[in-house]
Amino acid sequence: MLKIKVKNIHSDEVSELELPEEIFNYPLKEHLIYEAVKNFRANQRQGTASTKTRGKVSGSGKKLWRQKGTGRARIGSIRNPLWRTGGTVFGPQPRDYSYKMPKKARRNALKSVLSDKLRNDRIWVVDEFVLDSNKTKDTLAKLKNFDFDKLLIVDKKENSKLMLSTRNVPYIKTIDFSEINVYDSLKYNYIMFSVDAVKQLVEVLK
């Protein structure tokens, strides 16, 4: 078992917490991390890009001039893709880019990222996020003792004051423990867990 120091919201050490090595001392597997990020981004795509083929472009079907004798190139339709106002050949059409990644591979990718963060002292565990108000200024004042540039806070959705007070801060993201993913874990340089959140995450990843 690994031991990590538990701090309060003011960055004072209050206790220690044991973390399982099979989750927080997992080897770095870059190929799994790559696949997990690719899967996450593909699932986020709207897939609404659409172009008009020659069959969808508006315009008459009349032949513009006779086939032979004019000296000009032959043309059958004003909607021909060769023309500026014509249709698009092989353009993008609406499609679903999402696909499923094996659950075990996805979990192992998350273990790999979390273990790497912990090895580099980029994971903090806080006993609890007790806030007096949902004002952004007050929350940032309490977090000022932690040295970070981009922070991912993992707690429970029930903590509405924390969610509301950080949602407008561009360099902080607060999520429920069930929403943690490889992409956000990589995007934010530091991760801050509440004790309850990290315990529940361990139960999920076991």
Predicted stretch roles:
Residues E30-K68:
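A short, flexible low-complexity segment enriched in Lys/Arg and Gly/Pro that occurs
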Residues M1-Q46, G91-K206:
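Extended polybasic, low-complexity segments that bind anionic RNA or targeting/receptor surfaces
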